[in-house]
Amino acid sequence: MLDTVAKADGIDALMLDIGAKAKAAARPLAIASADQKNAALMAMSEAILSGKSQIIAANAIDLKAAETAGLAASFIDRLTLNEERITAMAKGLREVAELKDPVSEVIAAWERPNGLKIERVRTPLGVIGVIYESRPNVTADAGALCLKSGNAVILRGGSDSVNSSRAIHACLVAGLVAAGLPDHAIQLVPVTDRAAVGAMLTGLNGTIDVIVPRGGKSLVARVQSDARVPVFAHLEGLCHVYVDGSADLDMAKSIVVNAKMRRTGICGSAETLLVDSAAIGSHLMPLLEALTEAGCEIRASATVLKVFPGLKAAVDEDWRTEYLDAIISVAVVDGIGGAIDHIARYSSNHTEAVIAEDPAVVERFFNEVDSAILLHNASTQFADGGEFGMGGEIGIATGKMHARGPVGVEQLTSFKYRVHGTGQIRP
C-alpha cells in the first residue's frame, strides 16, 4: 500500500514539474518569430530523416510486443512505421513550416464612431495536452502544429507506441535546440502509468489550457468525464456513405471501395454504406460485388440480404460500430430522408459523404446532416487536415465549441482585441 502511494506521489510530482516547464516555455514560444519556429521545424524534419534507422528499430520493439499480445491487424497498421511513413512524417513537418504563421494575424479590424480602432488578432492558447494511443506519428504531428501556433505541448502517447514515440520525440527536441527554442516546448511524458493521464486531466495546477484526446471511445469518454480543463473531443470516426439513386454507378463504386478499403484503420474510413431504395435494382448489387471483390466483409440489413443472401446479417450494434477493419455495414434507406434519419441516429458526427448528381439531394444532405465534415462525390478518406491544406491536424474535433473538423494551426489559437485610441475617455 505504501509503495502504491509513493508511486502515485512520484508521478504527481513528475507531472507537476512537466507542467511548470511547459508553462515556462510557453512565454518565449508565444513571441518567437515565424522564422525561428520554421527553422526548428526544418531541423526536426532533417533529424527524423537522419534518424530513420533508429526510429524503425524502436518501432520494431513496439510491433513485436503488439504481435505477441495478439493485437488486431488494424491496430498494428496504425502502429507501424516504415521508411515510406517516416519520410511522409518528415515531409509533414516541412509542410507545417511552409504554412502561414497564425500568431498575431489580424482576423478582423474596424473603427468605431468615436475613433477607436479595434483589431481582433490570433494568439496562442498556451499549453496544450495531447493524449493519444497507438499512432506514433501523432508525436510529430502534434508537436509540429503546436509549435507553429506558438503553443507548448505535453504529449502522452500510448504504452503500445512508447519506444516509437520516444525516438520521434528526440528528433523534435533536437530541432528545438538547433533553433534556439526552449527544449521543454515539446515534452513527452516519460512514464506509461495511467496515473499520468489522470494528472494531466486535472490541468497540472493550471498549467494546461486545453486537452486534445486522440484514441478510442473509452479514452475520449474518460477525458470528457474527468477533465477540469477544456477538451477538443476527437470521437470515433463512424463515417457513412450515402449512394443516391441519381449517383453515377462507376463513380459510386470507386468512391465506396476507396472510402472503406484504402486504409481501414483510420478514422476517415467508411463504416456504413446507405443505398437509396430507388437504386436497389441498378446500384446495390454492383456496389456489394465491388466491396466483396476488394476483400471487404459485409454486414447486411434484411433488405440487402434479399438481394445478396450469402452475406452476414447485421445486428443493431453493427450500425454503432467503428470497425477499423475490412468490414462495412450496408443498409437500404428510403431516399435522402431515410439516409439523414439513419445518420442522425447512429453517427458520431465526424464525417459523412453523399454520392449524387441531383443538386437538391446534395443541398439537403449538406443542410440537414450535423457532422463536422460533409463530402459530395468524394471519399471519406479525405477527412484529414493535410488533405484540407492545413499541413496535418492534431485531431478531428467532433464537438461544436471553438474547433470543429480538422484541428490545424489556426484552430490551436485563440484571439485577443487590440484597441488603439487617441486619448478617448468614456462619457
Curated annotation (Swiss-Prot):
Record's catalysed reaction(s): L-glutamate 5-semialdehyde + phosphate + NADP(+) = L-glutamyl 5-phosphate + NADPH + H(+)
E.C. no: 1.2.1.41
Gene Ontology biological process terms, A to Z: L-proline biosynthetic process
Principal cellular location given in the protein's record: cytoplasm
InterPro entries, A to Z: Ald_DH/histidinol_DH (IPR016161), Ald_DH_C (IPR016163), Ald_DH_N (IPR016162), Aldehyde_DH_dom (IPR015590), G-glutamylP_reductase_CS (IPR020593), Glu-5-SA_DH (IPR012134), GPR_dom (IPR000965)
SUPFAM superfamilies named among the record's database cross-references: ALDH-like
Keyword rRNA-binding found: no
GO cellular component, one term: cytoplasm
Functional pathway: Amino-acid biosynthesis; L-proline biosynthesis; L-glutamate 5-semialdehyde from L-glutamate: step 2/2
Cited Pfam families: Aldedh (PF00171)
Gene Ontology molecular function: glutamate-5-semialdehyde dehydrogenase activity; NADP binding
Subcellular location: Cytoplasm
UniProt KW keywords: Amino-acid biosynthesis, Cytoplasm, NADP, Oxidoreductase, Proline biosynthesis
Family (UniProt): Belongs to the gamma-glutamyl phosphate reductase family.
Its biological purpose: Catalyzes the NADPH-dependent reduction of L-glutamate 5-phosphate into L-glutamate 5-semialdehyde and phosphate. The product spontaneously undergoes cyclization to form 1-pyrroline-5-carboxylate.
Protein name: Gamma-glutamyl phosphate reductase
